[in-house]
Regions:
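Acidic/histidine-rich catalytic neighborhood of metal-dependent amide-processing enzymes
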Residues: 140-243, 268, 272
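Extracytoplasmic/secreted proteins, especially bacterial periplasmic and envelope-associated proteins
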Residues: 47-57, 70, 74-81, 151-158, ...
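Solvent-exposed loop/turn segments at secondary-structure junctions
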Residues: 62-63, 92-95, 113-114, 124-128, ...
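Active-site-adjacent substrate-binding region
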Residues: 90, 217, 224-333
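A non-catalytic alpha/beta surface segment that caps or lines the substrate-entry region
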Residues: 53-113
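Bacterial Sec-dependent N-terminal signal peptides
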Residues: 1-36
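N-terminal capping segment at the start of a domain
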Residues: 25-71, 82, 295-312
Length: 333
């Protein structure tokens, strides 16, 4: 899913690796938050896992396919069932290779009458090509996208389920499922790797906002179910929304999930939050894993491979992210 600002990212990784080793112990004692009591309902990791598996049961959600369209209908039906007001944003978007993509952004609104709103988002399409697979014979095969796609939507669906059954949340929440995120230029192509070839649905959403729409801030959930995932603080997020980064990472530590959210910087990522920040003007962070020691990819060993399947989805990771987001929402004033 994402493209990395490759040269800059490589430099950042080296700098971070060196600096974090030298300052880790002193930084921890200075910034470690106190423990706080849980607020809000319990996030059910088994339910989120089932939502992830259901999306995968349709097959890879590739653009312009029946599996993609059927999964989209199912996602909308789930949000409607939880009492959300659901709208779609349909568009024909031109891909890097000239292919016209039938894109559908799905927007589900909890308590749409409220003006104080938090934006949660994830992409729901899956990558057409396993172009980072260690076996080159798999490079043109589709990716299931259990983590890279389904996991973020699964967490949002479980959040929608638990807040819809609870009457104490007094803010509005917008759940946006972005389409056409993962159709960026493949590594095997001779075409230049344009950053704009990624996050097409999010770009369209950001450029076609309803008049007067505002959100206090946004959180992008990307690849939030993987085994061994750790969510470092992404650089674009810190540039545009450092206060939100601090809030989320501090909250995770306060409720016992600090090991999943290290107080350390990760790379600079091209992802759906970039147009949300730059085009929509909504401060938005990206919760995305960073594997500094993974040779296959800093996004983890299954990223853009045929192994991005349910076998590598971890309920504990879903729980850490989901319960942190419950705490964030129910701590808003």
């Amino acid at each position: 899913m994402k493209s990395i600002f490759s040269v800059l990212f490589a430099f950042v990784v080296v700098v971070i690796a060196c600096s974090c080793i030298s300052c880790k112990s002193s930084r921890k004692s200075a910034t470690e938050p106190d423990t706080v009591a849980l607020v809000g309902p319990t996030f059910n990791a088994d339910s989120a896992y089932a939502f992830c598996a259901k999306q995968c049961s349709f097959g890879p959600r590739l653009m312009n396919t029946e599996a993609h369209d059927k999964c989209g209908e199912w996602i909308m039906k789930q949000f409607v069932g939880y009492g959300m007001k659901v709208e779609t944003q349909d568009a024909e978007l031109k891909a890097w290779d000239g292919t016209m993509l039938r894109s559908r952004n799905i927007w589900a609104r909890f308590r749409p009458e409220l003006t104080t709103r938090i934006l949660l988002c994830a992409h729901w399409d899956s990558r057409p090509w396993a172009d980072n697979d260690p076996d080159s014979t798999n490079w043109r095969k589709p990716v299931m996208g259990a983590n890279d796609g389904a996991s973020g939507v699964a967490v949002m669906l479980e959040l929608a389920r638990v807040i819809s059954s609870d009457s104490t949340l007094n803010i509005g929440v917008d759940f946006v499922c972005f389409d056409a995120e993962d159709y960026g230029v493949p590594q095997w192509s001779s075409a230049p790797d344009s950053q704009d070839s990624w996050a097409l649905g999010a770009q369209y959403w950001a450029e076609h906002q309803p008049q007067g729409y505002e959100a206090r801030y946004g959180v992008l959930l990307d690849m939030v179910g993987g085994e061994g995932a750790r969510f470092y603080q992404e650089s674009v997020s810190k540039q545009y929304a450092s206060e939100i980064v601090n809030k989320v990472w501090r909250t995770a530590s306060q409720i016992g999930y600090g090991s999943y959210f290290p107080m350390q910087e990760g790379g600079m990522i091209t992802d759906d939050h970039v147009p949300v920040n730059e085009k929509a003007g909504i401060a938005c962070i990206d919760i995305i894993p960073f594997y500094p020691d993974c040779q296959q990819s800093s996004f983890g060993p299954t990223w853009h491979t045929i192994n991005d399947t349910m076998e590598h989805i971890d309920r504990a990771t879903l729980k850490a992210v989901g319960q942190t987001m419950v705490q964030i929402l129910y701590s808003e004033k």
